[in-house]
A protein has these predicted regions:
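Glycine-rich loop(s) and the adjacent beta-strand/alpha-helix scaffold that form part
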Residues: 3-8, 16-88, 265, 284, ...
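A glycine-rich dinucleotide-binding beta-alpha-beta segment and adjacent secondary-structure elements
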Residues: 4-11, 189-271, 278
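Generic recognition of stable, solvent-exposed alpha-helical segments in well-folded globular domains
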Residues: 29-30, 38-45, 56, 167-174, ...
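Generic, well-ordered alpha-helical scaffold segments in large soluble proteins
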Residues: 37, 49, 143, 175-186, ...
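FAD cofactor-binding and catalytic pocket of flavoenzymes
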Residues: 54-183, 190, 217, 223, ...
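A conserved FAD-binding loop/helix module that cradles the flavin
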Residues: 271-292
Length: 296
């Protein structure tokens, strides 16, 4: 359905419903309770469009930045078939007060590989894609400590500002090095990163090959357009807490200072989670539903 909620209707310090567009038509829905669940990008944007004025609204956006290291195996892997996500490792999940990274196996469909593999020339890219059946990957999922921000432009469209901090980049560098070691131990005969330039090494290049490769990875860089980074989980832009100066919703998921207005999604996480967030999201929604239902 072509429907977009543009704002929450506030009467004084109380939410009484929402205003939406349905195709060319305007729609108003009045309700005793309004629950925002647009995710960590659109929930803060909706609250900002509605005139909610809290100092941390849209801030602290966490993304679980993710990348991978690839390895070419002698045997056929066919990374697009079989169990989609069957293994993970939390060996490095707590490098510093709960922050670190996880390894996860994820499928590499040809379209995704074409996006992630470095581009040197059409011929090189074609040759690399023909080797895809023999490619394995170590997926990296970073628990980011230092977040970004969601704002809105003049039309109310969400605008995301995010850059991986020096602190989180240090964990990213360690993750890439550890992923290469993992693939090497698994038998990879060539290992590379999804950077904008071809940065690879072969374990048979002799002692110190991986360390020399690490220097070239650093030289290729970790900034935007240097390294392919994706986000699977957006969190913490309407974070929960007891103080309106440092959070957006209270422990009952109600927006500070506004009656009848609640947020129930991953944006209410106080920080990035240390694991995939789906169970926590469901738990938050279940608890919020019980609290709201009891109050109506």
């Amino acid at each position: 359905m072509d429907c977009e909620v543009r704002r929450v209707i506030l009467e004084g310090r109380y939410a009484v419903g929402v205003e939406a567009r349905v195709g060319p038509y305007a729609l108003r829905v009045r309700a005793r309770a309004t629950v925002v669940a647009g995710g960590a990008i659109h929930s803060p944007a909706l609250l900002l469009r509605s005139g909610v004025d809290l100092p941390t609204l849209g801030g602290h956006l966490a993304l679980h930045p993710a990348t991978a290291v690839f390895g070419l195996m002698d045997e056929e892997v066919r990374p697009w078939t079989g169990t989609l996500q069957g293994h993970y490792s939390d060996e490095f999940a707590d490098l510093d007060r709960g922050y670190g990274f996880k390894f996860e196996t994820v499928p590499i469909h040809p379209s995704l590989a074409a996006l992630a593999f470095p581009w040197e020339s059409a011929r090189d890219h074609r040759d690399l894609m023909t080797r895809l059946p023999h490619v394995a990957l170590a997926g990296i999922l970073l628990r980011d400590r230092d977040g970004g921000r969601v704002t809105v432009d003049r039309d109310g469209t969400p605008v995301v500002s995010y850059r991986v901090s020096e602190y989180d980049t240090a964990h990213l560098r360690r993750a890439i090095a550890a992923a290469a070691e993992l693939l090497e131990a698994a038998g990879a005969r060539e290992i590379w990163t999804p950077q904008s330039r071809w940065v690879a090494y072969r374990p048979d290049e002799g002692p110190g090959a991986r360390a020399r490769w690490g220097g070239r990875v650093d030289a290729a860089g970790y900034s935007p357009n240097d390294l392919l980074l994706v986000t699977f989980h957006q969190m913490a832009s309407c974070r929960m807490g007891g103080d309106a100066r440092t959070s957006v919703v209270n422990p009952d998921n109600q927006v500070h200072g506004i009656g009848g207005l609640f947020v129930a999604d991953a944006s209410t996480f106080p920080t990035a989670s240390g694991v995939n967030p789906m169970l926590t999201i469901m738990a938050i929604a279940h608890r919020a539903a019980r609290i709201i239902g009891a109050a109506l």
